[in-house]
Amino acid sequence: MVSCGSGTACVLGNDEGYVHVGGTGLGGGTIRGLCKLLFNEDDPVKINSLSLNGDVTKVDHILSDVVSGPIGNLPKNSSAVNFGKGLSLEPNNSDLAAGVINMVAQTILRTAIMSAISSGVSEIVIIGRTPKYKLLTNILEEGFKLYNLNYEFVEGGEYAICLGTI
């Protein structure tokens, strides 16, 4: 299970119980905090809307910008340097929102994939409020497919933590 909240935790559950197998401090709190610092917006609904109109290639160097050929099975439009174009371009707020969400989503994705692989599982359940960012969900879906992992975004998953405490 990948719990995407303010940060992100990866938990392995089976008949014997639950164990924390990984995580990162990046999550929805990072998205809101960085967007507030970069362009003075911390409303998740507005950030989500902005990101869907943004172009991450305006802030990130992608693989085709920095290498001449393929790297494994990664798509050539994968980010190679998050915010690497920040020194040369002037992105708009939508591009910045897309860049922030992309960076957080990629970190969550890699953490989830490595946690799953190291635990020998191929099924991932995603809970939490952070997947409400549509761009983040799209990035996670693409990555899980690339690694042939089965995944499910739980409907009402933003309430899963609350239900688990009852």
Task: Place the predicted regions along the sequence by residue.
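Short beta-strand scaffold segments in enzyme catalytic cores
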Residues: 7-13
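Adenine-nucleotide phosphate-binding core of ATP-dependent small-molecule kinases
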Residues: 72-123
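Glycine- and other small-residue-rich loops at beta-strand/loop junctions that grip anionic moieties
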Residues: 23, 97, 101, 129, ...
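Glycine-rich phosphate-binding/hydrolytic loop that grips phosphoryl groups
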Residues: 31-36, 43, 106, 149-166
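Glycine-rich phosphate-binding loops at beta-strand->alpha-helix junctions
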Residues: 114-117, 121-143, 157-158
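Glycine-rich phosphate-binding loop plus the immediately following alpha-helix
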Residues: 15-68
